[in-house]
Curated annotation (Swiss-Prot):
Gene Ontology BP, a term: negative regulation of canonical NF-kappaB signal transduction
Coiled coil residues, start to end: 22-62
Leader peptide range in chain numbering: none
UniProt subcellular location: Cytoplasm
Site (Cleavage by EMCV protease 3C): 197, 291
Organism per entry: Homo sapiens
Protein's name in the database: TRAF family member-associated NF-kappa-B activator
Modified residues (N-acetylmethionine): 1
Result when mutating residue 272 to A: Complete loss of cleavage by Seneca Valley virus protease 3C
Length: 425
């Protein structure tokens, strides 16, 4: 019994399972068919809408053609018939025939108008709604576009006005530089660049510092750069108001009188010394008197220029007085000068003379300048003027004249000493 029941249950389960599978397959097939049908329906609806639009276009074209044909048929043929009949009439025909002909012409004209009017009404009714709808849409889009373009134009104009108010032209900074001659194409520009200015008395030999700042320097480095450049004779490029710098004029030396006087004195000294070596002291004194040059000033200037210049055949005129030998000289020979001549050499090439050699002095910044007090050290007497010098009376070593500081000045004392050299005493 149990086996039979189990077999029956298995069969029933298999049948139920098969029925469920058939149901599922039927449902799936139904879904696929419905989807296919819906897709076909959509495609057919699209085709119908497309065909409807084509039909509407064809109807509109047909209405336009019919309207043109009706206008031509209603006006032109009637005129032709009336004109031909009127032209064919003769004066011999009776008046009644003319009246009857006109009446005949009016009858077909009225009939044609009655036939054409229902056609126009039907065409307007059939195609009036789609044409009016399309025309309304076109007009609406046109006016929308026109309004949008008008807004864009107004906005662009407002932006232009606002930018023109905000746009301030920047003033270009003028750079201080010289324009070469070959870069100017017009003659008036060249003449304007090289026109002589009012500042013609500027000494080109002296070091000049312009307001041109070197490139790559900050504001805090500008002062130090000027201090370093002030030690040299640096020539900066000319500015617009200083174009005379480009003229090919010979430069004037900074100090003319001492250089020329020393050159003349040197030539005359060499000639006189070769002719008569014994009288070279007097010759040198007369040369200084002829040129009108202070020997002390010439000697000091010569000492200052020894480190800056390098002449080849000049003579170092080192002026020395005989203050320490004043007791041995007669009273009238105080104007004699002893000139020690040595060829001027470069400090690197010149041999170092011994300190014990008489009549020679070591060149360089350590060389002492002539002092009216030979017995004192160089540190105790300073020509620049100190507080101790203001209270010490000055005594002339030539004539033993006393110059108290309360009455006389340092300039008076120096002029008195210069009078001894020029032979005024």
């Amino acid at each position: 019994m149990d086996k039979n029941i189990g077999e029956q249950l298995n069969k029933a389960y298999e049948a139920f399972r098969q029925a469920c599978m058939d149901r599922d397959s039927a449902v799936k097939e139904l879904q696929q068919k419905t989807e296919n049908y819906e897709q076909r329906i959509r495609e057919q609806q699209e085709q119908l809408s497309l065909q409807q639009t084509i039909i509407d276009k064809l109807k509109s074209q047909l209405l336009l053609v019919n309207s043109t044909q009706d206008n031509n048929y209603g006006c032109v043929p009637l005129l032709e018939d009336s004109e031909t009949r009127k032209n064919n009439l003769t004066l011999d025909q009776p008046q009644d025939k003319v009246i009857s002909g006109i009446a005949r012409e009016k009858l077909p004209k009225v009939r044609r108008q009655e036939v054409s009017s229902p056609r126009k009404e039907t065409s307007a009714r059939s195609l009036g709604s789609p044409l009016l709808h399309e025309r309304g849409n076109i007009e609406k889009t046109f006016w929308d576009l026109k309004e949008e373009f008008h807004k864009i134009c107004m906005l662009a104009k407002a932006q232009k006005d606002h930018l023109s108010k905000l746009n301030i032209p920047d003033t270009a900074t003028e750079t201080q530089c010289s324009v070469p001659i070959q870069c100017t194409d017009k003659t008036d520009k060249q003449e304007a660049l090289f026109k002589p200015q009012a500042k013609d008395d500027i000494n080109r030999g002296a070091p000049s510092i312009t307001s041109v700042t070197p490139r790559g320097l900050c504001r805090d480095e500008e002062d130090t750069s000027f201090e370093s450049l002030s030690k040299f004779n640096v020539k900066f490029p000319p500015m617009d108001n200083d174009s005379t710098f480009l003229h090919s004029t010979p430069e004037r030396p900074g100090i003319l009188s001492p250089a020329t006087s020393e050159a003349v004195c040197q030539e005359k000294f060499n000639m006189e010394f070769r002719d008569n070596p014994g009288n070279f002291v007097k010759t040198e004194e007369t040369l200084f008197e002829i040129q009108g040059i202070d020997p002390i000033a010439s000697a000091i200037q010569n000492l200052k220029t020894t480190d800056k210049t390098k002449p080849s055949n000049l003579v170092n005129t080192c002026i020395r007085t005989t203050l320490d030998r004043a007791a041995c000289l007669p009273p009238g020979d105080h104007n004699a000068l002893y000139v020690n001549s040595f060829p001027l050499l470069d400090p690197s090439d010149a041999p170092f003379p011994s300190l014990d050699s008489p009549g020679k002095a070591i060149r360089g910044p350590q060389q002492p300048i002539w002092k009216p007090f030979p017995n004192q050290d160089s540190d105790s007497v300073v020509l620049s003027g100190t507080d101790s010098e203001l209270h010490i009376p000055r005594v002339c070593e030539f004539c033993q004249a006393v110059f108290p500081p309360s009455i006389t000045s340092r300039g008076d004392f120096l002029r008195h000493l210069n009078s001894h050299f020029n032979g005024e005493t």
